[in-house]
Regions:
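Glycine-rich phosphate/adenylate-binding loop and adjacent beta-alpha elements
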Residues: 70-94, 99
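Short strand-turn-strand beta-turns centered on an Asx-Gly dipeptide
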Residues: 8, 24-25, 70-72
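Ferredoxin-type iron-sulfur electron-transfer modules in oxidoreductases and energy-metabolism complexes
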Residues: 31-50, 97-247
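Short, contiguous acidic and Ser/Thr-rich linear segments
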Residues: 20-32
Length: 247
């Protein structure tokens, strides 16, 4: 398979970027998208050109590092997968593929396709941890949790923090990310102790870092590689309002 790649190139955060066109040939349909970029970079290095910088780590859809807008979609045209889990068979032979970094004011470009997603780390730090007893091992089944609650918590905890929600949202909102983190603990008794403080702190930090407001367009849910529901945003709103009423 042969492809024409239009890739965003930007030397650093202060430089002006532009799209550059590259050709890749004889790509197997079973090649992953990131492997295809590896092949391109090998060719560029052999030609004495600067390779394309892009984020990656586990390449198993777990770490959330791969953060590419591909043909206008976060993580590409495939549903419920991250960029590293997508294969070239999803594209037509001879087609043009446009690749660019996340477009969000809170995710400034570092170089080429690499963005700084440290804002998500700051939101997580604002949320803090849960209280646990450190002097003994808890007894098994001492805290019963309904299966429905455990399932909802695990669904929310599937978030890998890739940033697709904020990058896709027309307002640049990180509400789905924050909601997933808050909801994963709000459904468990262990997370209730600091629940009010956590909701207020994470929302405040999100606003402070320049993320936009949620207007419920649902784009984040549609592009989320872990298919996290916007129902968690409703839970975040409820947790936040309840916490503010207690002030």
């Amino acid at each position: 398979m042969n492809f024409t790649l239009k890739i965003w190139r930007q030397k650093d955060a202060k430089s002006k970027g532009e799209f550059k066109t590259y050709q890749v040939e004889n790509i197997s349909a079973d090649t992953s998208f990131l492997e295809m970029l590896d092949i391109l970079n090998n060719d560029l290095v052999h030609k004495g050109e600067e390779p394309v910088a892009f984020d990656h780590d586990c390449r198993e859809g777990i770490c959330g590092m791969c953060s590419l807008h591909i043909n206008g979609h976060a993580h590409g045209p495939a549903q419920a997968v991250t960029t590293c889990q997508m294969y070239m068979r999803k594209f037509k032979d001879g087609s043009t593929i446009t690749i660019e970094p996340w477009r969000s004011a809170a995710f400034p470009v570092i170089k080429d396709l690499v963005v700084n997603r440290g804002a998500y780390d700051e939101i997580l730090q604002a949320g803090g941890f849960i209280s646990v007893r450190t002097n003994s091992v808890p007894d098994g089944n001492a805290i019963p949790i309904a299966k429905a609650d455990a399932d909802e918590s695990m669904d929310a905890a599937a978030c890998v923090g890739c940033g697709a929600c904020a990058a896709t949202c027309k307002n640049g909102s990180a509400m789905l990310f924050v909601a997933a983190r808050v909801s994963s603990l709000a459904k468990l008794p262990q997370g209730r102790v600091e629940g009010a403080r956590r909701a207020k702190a994470m929302v405040a930090k999100m606003d402070e870092l320049g993320f936009g407001n949620c207007t419920n367009t649902g784009a984040c849910q549609a592009e989320c590689p872990k298919q996290i529901s916007i129902a968690h945003i409703a839970r975040l709103n409820r947790e936040f309002l309840a916490a503010k009423l207690k002030d």
